[in-house]
UniProtKB/Swiss-Prot annotation:
Pathway: Aminoacyl-tRNA biosynthesis; selenocysteinyl-tRNA(Sec) biosynthesis; L-seryl-tRNA(Sec) from L-serine and tRNA(Sec): step 1/1. GO terms for cellular component: cytoplasm. Pfam families: Seryl_tRNA_N, tRNA-synt_2b. GO terms for molecular function: ATP binding; serine-tRNA ligase activity. It comes from Pyrobaculum neutrophilum (strain DSM 2338 / JCM 9278 / NBRC 100436 / V24Sta). This is Serine--tRNA ligase. PROSITE patterns: AA_TRNA_LIGASE_II. The gene is serS. Homodimer. The tRNA molecule binds across the dimer.
Length: 447
């Protein structure tokens, strides 16, 4: 089976038009592709016919008497010249067609919502009781308790109350969206990573630390490079880009690999720093460590048989829900609207934690089924019974992004005296470390 987008363009172009419209993209791309693909097929037939004719003439020339051989050789020369010309035209059309095919986003699952302006997601489920400040509106259908006093925001908790982060000095020496993290928040960062790695490894995911940089020809195959080239960092003078997530390095691990059916699924849990320019963020979340240029993240990644990928999409989403739920953080799962999916994803869930000081849910994790969008570009196939070859499906899902999870803990677990209770699920990962906090993080003594 060939690439699903190519199959749809050839056999059901109206469906692709519908997908592009739902994604708010240019539907005329379909007509341009059909035109190029038709021209390529025509030239391919002509090339095949010319090759057959040339081979036949070559065989005739070998058997022909001397008086006919010169005539056959001349015809063969004419055919060879014609073949070379048509082959060059076919290759040029093929390059243009492939470039256009790469610009198409993934198809979308039937359950992906098509949303009106101003709506980016649809709630699916929620967990936990949220705290809502008196007088503020509560989300519909969510259990909540009213509190009189507004909680302290995560930025002020980290920098002012606890005194364990410094974005002002980091801004002086590195620029905005960088930070210094100190003392118990450092241990909390490591504990969150170990917690997620340990839990997921126990579920059969293989731990991996991927390369932190990838070559251009590789990174352009794992993400929508034209859209995100301004959001990732390039190493000056080198053919290398810093990864924005462990997903990129893990996906590239099987670049140009041929698998057999029995090898799948392959489950990985990666840890890496993530480097992001946050070019489109503007002035959003400038305070604190919620949206920063570098952070640590644990990532689930699955290479799956095509027929199993939707089952795995639900499974890895539930894995992350379990991690967040066991931390005691109220959250909800939302189904991302078609126009906000990003090109690779056929469907995406976001998992959002409740931030009581802000009075809203904010994204902690994202879980996508990319189907064969990445594997087509990376050349990752599986040979099925009967020697049928297919592109594998790839899926990714945040385990925990440590700095964001810290911000959610700071808002949800703060006490009146300024201390922050450490979620019970994290305490076993802090216990062996003598210098680490065990049950509470207390404000740093100053002076």
């Amino acid at each position: 089976m060939s690439y699903s987008v190519l199959e749809a363009l050839r056999n059901n172009p109206d469906h692709v038009r519908k997908v592009l419209a739902a994604r708010r993209l240019d539907v005329s791309l379909v007509d341009r592709f059909i035109e190029l693909d038709g021209r390529w097929r025509q030239l391919k037939r002509e090339v095949d016919e010319l090759r057959r004719s040339y081979n036949q003439l070559s065989r005739e020339g070998a058997r022909a008497p001397p008086d006919r051989r010169r005539e056959i050789v001349e015809k063969a020369r004419e055919l060879a010249a014609r073949l070379e010309k048509v082959e060059k035209e076919m290759e040029a059309v093929e390059r243009e067609r492939e470039e256009l095919l790469w610009s198409f986003p993934n198809l979308i699952h039937d359950s992906v919502p098509v949303c009106p302006e101003g709506v980016d997601s649809v709630p699916v489920r929620h967990w936990g009781t949220i705290r809502v400040v008196k007088g503020a509106a509560a989300p519909e259908g969510v259990e909540y308790v009213v509190v009189e006093k507004p909680p302290v925001g995560h930025a002020d908790m980290a920098e002012v109350v606890l005194g364990m982060a410094d974005t002002l000095k980091a801004g002086e020496v590195a620029g905005s969206r960088f930070y210094y993290l100190f003392d118990d928040l450092v241990w909390l960062d490591f504990a969150l990573a170990m917690y997620a790695l340990d839990r997921l490894a126990q579920q059969g995911f293989r731990p991996v630390v991927p390369p932190y940089m990838l070559k251009f020809d590789v990174i352009r195959r794992v993400l929508d490079f034209d859209t995100f080239k301004d959001a990732i960092y390039k190493i000056e003078g080198e053919d290398l880009y810093l990864i924005a997530t462990a997903e990129h390095g893990i996906a590239a691990y099987l670049h140009k690999r041929e698998l057999v059916e029995e090898e799948l699924p392959l489950l990985f849990v990666g840890w890496s720093p993530c480097f992001r320019k946050e070019a489109g963020a503007g002035n959003r979340d400038l305070k604190g460590i919620f949206r920063v240029h570098i952070f640590h993240k644990v990532e689930q990644f699955v290479f799956s048989l095509p027929e199993d990928s939707w089952k795995w999409h639900e499974e890895i989403t539930k894995n992350t829900e379990s991690l967040i739920r066991d931390l005691g953080l109220p959250y909800r799962v939302v189904n991302i609207c078609a126009h906000d999916l990003g090109a690779p994803a056929a469907k995406k869930y976001d998992i959002e934690a409740w931030y009581p000081a802000q009075g809203m849910y904010r994204e902690l994790a994202s879980c996508s089924n990319v189907t064969d969008w990445q594997s087509y570009r990376l050349g990752i196939r599986v040979t099925r019974k009967g020697m049928r070859r297919e592109f594998v499906h790839t899926l990714n899902c945040t385990g925990l992004a440590t700095t964001r999870t810290i911000t959610a803990i700071l808002e949800n677990f703060q006490r009146e005296d300024g201390a922050v209770e450490i979620p019970k699920a994290l305490r076993p990962y802090l216990e062996p470390i003598r210098a680490a906090p065990k049950e509470y993080i207390y404000p740093r003594r100053r002076g």
